[in-house]
UniProtKB/Swiss-Prot annotation:
It comes from Borna disease virus 1 (BoDV-1). InterPro entries: BDV_P24. Homomultimer; only active in its oligomeric state. Interacts with nucleoprotein/N. Interacts with matrix/M protein. Interacts with host TBK1. Interacts with polymerase L. Interacts with host HMGB1; this interaction is required to stabilize RNP on chromosomes. A motif (Nuclear localization signal 2) lies at residues 181-193. The lineage of its organism: Viruses, Riboviria, Orthornavirae, Negarnaviricota, Haploviricotina. Essential component of the RNA polymerase transcription and replication complex. Acts as a scaffold which brings L in close proximity to the N-RNA complex. Plays a role in the segregation of the viral genome in host daughter cells during mitosis by interacting with host HMGB1, a host chromatin-remodeling DNA architectural protein, thereby stabilizing RNP on chromosomes. Interacts with host TBK1 and thus interferes with activation of cellular antiviral state. Inhibits cellular histone acetyltransferase activities. Changing R4G: In strain: C6. This is Phosphoprotein.
């Protein structure tokens, strides 16, 4: 025969709250195994797959229905923000590339005009001292133009690398790697050297 509790308080203290029992979870959540093909497929395809099935990178077995729904919505929002940010950055890079190309072309035109003016000035000059000074200036200008051309080449290579790293995962067309066709990288006409002018140093 079961013994009765000494008081009603004792009987309540001995009972366990069923809500507490249901909330207890054993062990830590198991890590979700990402499919192997997700590591090799393109970024844009992976973003599309994540939009359709956010649970592919989470473990729904360890969550309630409401928790899993909240988790899926959060993943969808994050994926959408990543895609939008990537597209915005690609547009900014394309605009920057256009500005750089225009500035480089304008710089080359200015250098060409300066070279032509120098040559015309030398042709109109009859004094040997002035011709010698102009010849030295042409040599300096030629060295400066060569240095600037090398700098422009390095800049274009860096821009290509920046564009390639930013345009991954978007539909932006990739620029060709350096060297590129003349329509993108204008070619500066070669300047005559001092030997071709028969300038005596």
């Amino acid at each position: 025969m079961a013994t009765r509790p000494s008081s009603l308080v004792d009987s309540l203290e001995d009972e366990e709250d069923p809500q507490t029992l249901r909330r207890e979870r054993s062990g830590s959540p198991r890590p979700r195994k990402i499919p192997r093909n997700a590591l090799t497929q393109p970024v844009d395809q992976l973003l599309k797959d994540l939009r359709k099935n956010p649970s592919m990178i989470s473990d729904p077995d360890q969550r309630t229905g409401r928790e899993q729904l909240s988790n899926d919505e959060l993943i969808k929002k994050l994926v959408t923000e990543l895609a939008e940010n990537s597209m915005i950055e690609a547009e900014e890079v394309r605009g920057t590339l256009g500005d750089i190309s225009a500035r480089i072309e304008a710089g080359f035109e200015s250098l060409s005009a300066l070279q032509v003016e120098t040559i015309q000035t030398a042709q109109r000059c009859d004094h040997s001292d002035s011709i010698r000074i102009l010849g030295e200036n042409i040599k300096i200008l030629d060295r400066s133009m060569k240095t600037m051309m090398e700098t422009m080449k390095l800049m274009m290579e860096k821009v290509d690398l920046l564009y390639a790293s930013t345009a991954v995962g978007t539909s932006a067309p990739m620029l060709p790697s350096h060297p590129a066709p003349p329509r993108i990288y204008p070619q500066l006409p070669s300047a005559p050297t001092a030997d071709e002018w028969d300038i005596i140093p």
